[in-house]
Every structure is written in C-alpha cells, then in structure tokens.
Amino acid sequence: LTEADEWRKEVWEMIKLRPDITFWLQTKRAERVLDNLPSWWGDGLENVIMVFTTENQKRADERLPILLDLPFKHKGIMCAPMISEITLDQYLSTGKFEIVLVDGENYEGNRPLYFDWVKKIYDECVKYNIKFDFCGTGNVFIKDGKTYNIPKAYQRVMALKSELQNPLIYKEKDIKIQPRCKTCKRRF
C-alpha cells in the first residue's frame, strides 16, 4: 500500500537488524514488491520469507511467476481464500517454494472450499517434499458431495482432522474439540 511507503525504510532496517526473528511478508500486490525492496537487499535475507496469496488459478498464474523471479531466499504460497481449484505443479516443480498454505473463505464470505481442491494441492506438495498446511476449512466446506457450514471457531480444528499436513503434525485422534458456548462459540 502506498500509505506504508513513508515508514517502509524503517521497517526494512528493523528486519535487517533482527536476524534472530523470521519475518513473514505476505502480499497480493506482486507487482509492487521489487520496487519497494531496499537498495542493500541483494539476493535477500535468511530471516525473511515472501508469500504471495493466490485465490484462484488466474491469480496464481499472474503472481507466482513474479515471485519466482524476485530475490528472496525463502518463498511460499498462500491459497486463501481459495475460491476455485488451483494447480501449482509447474511452480512447485521449480524447487523454489518452501511452504504452501490453504484456507477457505471466512467472515462474511460464503464461497465454498472443496476438499478435493485441498487434497490436490496437498498431493502436489508431497510430490515435491514441500511443507503444506491446511489452515482452515472456511465457512462452507464440501467433502464427498456433502456441504458443511463450519463456524470460525472450528475451522482450524476440522482442517487438522483432515490430516492434510506435510509433515503431519497431529494425528486425527489426538485433536480434541474443546467445549464451546452454543451462542458465542467461546471456549469454556
């Protein structure tokens, strides 16, 4: 955002001064990244991972070639909110991506996320030994032809229960759903 331009230099200096912290930079504005890197950037810093968001195939095909050419040592892809099927094979096969995350649409959004879409990207990540995190189902999740309306409070838990994680962090049997208030969904 252009509103951030006035303090961007200070942020870059802070990132440079703190190699002990990993900075996760995420954007959907692929075309602005190169012009906003500091003059001293070179081929990037070890403590920075650049992540581009891609909600559909069109955006993936627009943004990911840009990210492939940018000088970052660590790169990732965030498919969120994933609103249609996406194929990442041609990008993952380059060996330049370390992590892919997938999430459905939340808050006021009701566009569905299909389990088959998530599984396809998961399989692509496993094929190339790339970390994969299914972050959440979104409000509307479709699996095996059945539609599930999932409150925000349960979306991460349900994603973890799918065991679509690479590497697998939790086994489905180990994930407990904490009791929640039926009205506000807060944990007891």
What are these regions (language model features)?
Residues 1-36, 40-85, 97-114:
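Core AdoMet radical
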Residues 83, 89-188:
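Auxiliary Fe-S-binding modules of radical SAM enzymes
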